Amino acid sequence: PNMRLTMSLVLGVMAVIALVGALGGAPKDANLYQTQKALDNAKHAVKKGGTIILIGACPEGLGSKTFESWLVNAPTAHSMVERIGKQFQLGGHKAAAIGMVLENAAIDLVSEMDPDFVRSIFLNPRASAQEAFSAAMEKYGQDATVIAMPFGGATLPICK
């Protein structure tokens, strides 16, 4: 059955590391266009300067042609944010949303996409969730605050 579940997660503090998944398989993690929904929720849980570890298989790559065009042709992540302010375009809005997240946090992507391609769209490729988590813990230290959001697309963190 196709159930739509939305959870609110009340946080006492914002995390330095958010481990977020687009679990549930396709279509939730079919491509980055779909997986971005989990990223958009996770941004509310991470402190400025933190890292979001985004887990989504993305076997179809990026997804939308417009989304792809915005990502691959952007000279910088911030340029997508500037562009959406001047020229709203469906598909481009999701690329700009990624650009906005990147202004506050690093994004490590665990996916099936080619690592060089992932780097070219301003994300840090990781081979596994364990590799990404270990790298983040090394960067921030063992006392880092961590939040796990396995169903990121259906979880909205609220910081109190």
Where are these regions (language model features)?
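Membrane-embedded hairpin module used as a gating/binding unit in multi-pass transport
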Residues: P1, A15-K28
